[in-house]
A protein has these predicted regions:
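Conserved glycine-rich "GG(E/T)P / GGGxP" loop and the immediately following alpha-helix
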Residues: 154
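A short, compositionally biased domain-edge/stem linker segment
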Residues: 33-45
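Positively charged n-region of N-terminal signal peptides that target proteins for export
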Residues: 1-9
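N-terminal secretory/targeting leader peptides
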Residues: 21-28, 42-139, 149, 158-160, ...
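C-terminal motif of bacterial Sec signal peptides marking the signal peptidase cleavage site
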Residues: 16-19
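Short beta-strand-centered segments that line the small-molecule binding cleft or hinge
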Residues: 143
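N-terminal cationic leader/targeting segments used for protein routing and processing
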Residues: 3-4, 23, 27, 35
Length: 354
């Protein structure tokens, strides 16, 4: 009997301990972590809206700045993963050159090629950038306009006109091309030379400053004017002398470097501000690659053309650049009426760049 009682007590003890263990294993009622909430997540970056950029240019296939814009279009679409689409209308197929400034201001075009002379009406101080020897060389020009001075100039244009230049591409440097085989060392050597210039006050003043007798002739009539002796010469970048075949009716070229031609990709300011920071970076980076392509092509062509013209029988002379620069710029600075709109502080900044 005692034995049975002990067995029963032992069994009850085992069952009791098992129940206690089960109770301890049961979780205590606690509010669930973040009860009633979904787990916190890092907010996703908002998706960028797709962008279309309508680019109107008057450059034609074969021009370095045409090739540059095809490169720009390719890079932008690739780097944006197709988020930015560039529609380039070349050869003036969308807007003619004299229509483009109004088109980009109104937003009918998003980007155009422009330059200081085309934007003078809205920013008169820009006239100084088309003065003879404002820039001495390609390096001088690109250091200025693609550096801190350019940032200041482009921001100011954006504030004044609602359009923003983004870079400065090299088009070529204008040289003197004469019908006669004549060596030109200083402006005095151009005395009495009827030099064709575009028909505007600014261009005609440049012709006088160079020491010549400026004669306005339309570009379309220039070949015949050189051939018949209506004018004694003309000035243009070397690639233009080749493409227009002026070398067929002239006998000498003098390297004067009197005007470093450049062109600016200009975007509508409202369009620019509508882009995200990432999209702006893509556009700026693509333009820099396009600029390098354009500049390299034009520099290479100019170097090759010297030998080409010599092979065609033209004499190529080197002018005294210091003599030309000092006299030509001096004539601008002496003409207070011409320079009254210039920003002289900005002018001095440009001249100080080496």
């Amino acid at each position: 009997m005692k034995k049975s009682l002990l067995v029963l007590l032992a069994l009850m003890l085992v069952l009791s301990l098992g129940a206690c263990a089960k109770e301890e294993a049961k979780p205590v009622d606690q509010p669930a972590e973040n009860a009633g909430e979904t787990p916190a997540e890092v907010p996703a970056e908002p998706a960028e809206d797709p962008v279309e950029l309508v680019f109107s240019i008057n450059a034609v296939p074969g021009d370095a700045h045409y090739e540059a814009m095809m490169k720009f279009e390719e890079i932008v679409e690739e780097k944006s993963g197709g988020n930015i689409k560039v529609d380039t209308y070349h050869s003036g197929s969308l807007f003619k050159q004299d229509q483009e400034t109004a088109a980009v201001k109104s937003g009918e075009a998003d980007i155009i090629y422009s330059s200081a002379p085309w934007l003078v009406e809205g920013s008169p101080w820009l006239s100084m950038f088309n003065a003879g020897y404002m820039f001495k060389t390609y390096d001088h020009m690109t250091k200025a306009l693609n550096g801190e001075v350019g940032e200041e100039v482009f921001e100011r244009v954006a504030q004044e006109q609602g359009i923003r230049p983004l870079s400065a591409f090299y088009l070529g440097t204008r040289q003197i091309n004469l019908v006669a085989d004549k060596e030109v060392k200083t402006p005095a050597d151009l005395n009495g030379v009827n030099l064709r210039m575009p028909n505007s006050d600014a261009w005609l003043f440049l012709g006088k400053a160079l020491g010549a007798n400026p004669t306005p002739i339309a570009f379309s009539e220039l070949y015949m004017a050189l051939q018949t002796g209506t004018v004694d010469g003309q000035d243009n970048p070397l690639p233009t002398v080749q493409s227009a075949k002026f070398y067929e009716v002239t006998k000498s070229i003098t390297i004067t470097n009197h005007l470093v031609d450049n062109v600016w990709p200009v975007i509508n300011e409202a369009k620019w501000q509508s882009l995200s920071d990432n999209q702006k970076t893509i556009v700026v980076d693509a333009l820099e690659e396009a600029r390098q392509l354009c500049d390299d092509l034009n520099l290479q062509r100019e170097a090759e053309l010297i030998e080409f013209f010599k092979g065609e029988g033209l004499s190529v002379y080197e002018a005294d650049l210091d003599a030309f620069s000092e006299e030509v710029l001096g004539k601008y600075l002496d003409n207070k009426e011409l320079t009254e709109t210039w920003d002289m502080d900005l002018f001095e900044k440009v001249q100080a760049i080496k």
